[in-house]
Regions:
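Conserved helicase motor core of P-loop NTPases
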Residues: 1-105, 116
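Conserved flavin/dinucleotide-binding core of flavoenzymes
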Residues: 108
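C-terminal accessory regions
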Residues: 111-175
């Protein structure tokens, strides 16, 4: 990974690792890339509690077939086997990210946790070292985190990363 990061910074092509630590999967178009990502997430059992925190899907953008918003909705449905009910945003077990600093609660932009209970009025989230209740407008400080932007992932570490690079995202693909 370090070797390939150095190559990318130089503008050179990555070298796939035969052992499987680093591999490149080519897609014909955005829909094909989306299908490949979903298949990889199924293969890697992304819905498993432990795997949710070890695996991360990264995309440069929020919009589009391979964007974070569409991927999160699709991964949520894949993991739970159904769409979230009307009036709800999260299922228990969903991987979520805090999107702004909340100094009173000690939760900061980019913190990732797991929903343990959700109602239309409240969302209860377990973080590494605490449990936090979100009520009213605070609920909008959370978003699904099965897929996140490269920007939001900066400073984080993951066991496994699925990184989407598509020509349709060309304006976001600078070294």
């Amino acid at each position: 990974i370090v070797e390939n990061a150095a190559l990318i910074r130089k503008g050179e092509m990555c070298v796939p690792d035969e052992a499987g630590e680093f591999r490149i999967v080519y897609a014909a178009d955005d829909e094909d890339a989306y299908r490949i990502v979903m298949d990889l997430c199924r293969e890697l059992n992304y819905g498993n509690e432990e795997n949710k925190m070890l695996l991360q899907v990264l995309s440069p953008m929020y919009r589009g077939v391979c964007g974070v918003d569409h991927l999160n909705e699709s991964l949520q449905e894949m993991i739970h086997g159904e769409k979230v009910p009307d009036g709800m945003k999260f299922f228990p077990g969903d991987k979520v990210m805090q999107t702004r600093n909340d100094y009173e609660k000690g939760i900061y932009n980019g913190d990732v946790g797991t929903v343990w209970t959700a109602t239309p009025q409240k969302v209860f989230v377990r973080y590494f070292d605490k449990e936090v209740v979100y009520e009213g407008e605070e609920r909008f400080d959370l978003r699904l985190a099965y897929a996140v932007t490269v920007h939001k992932s900066q400073g984080s570490e993951y066991e496994t990363v699925i990184f989407i690079l598509r020509p349709s995202q060309h304006n976001m693909l600078q070294r």
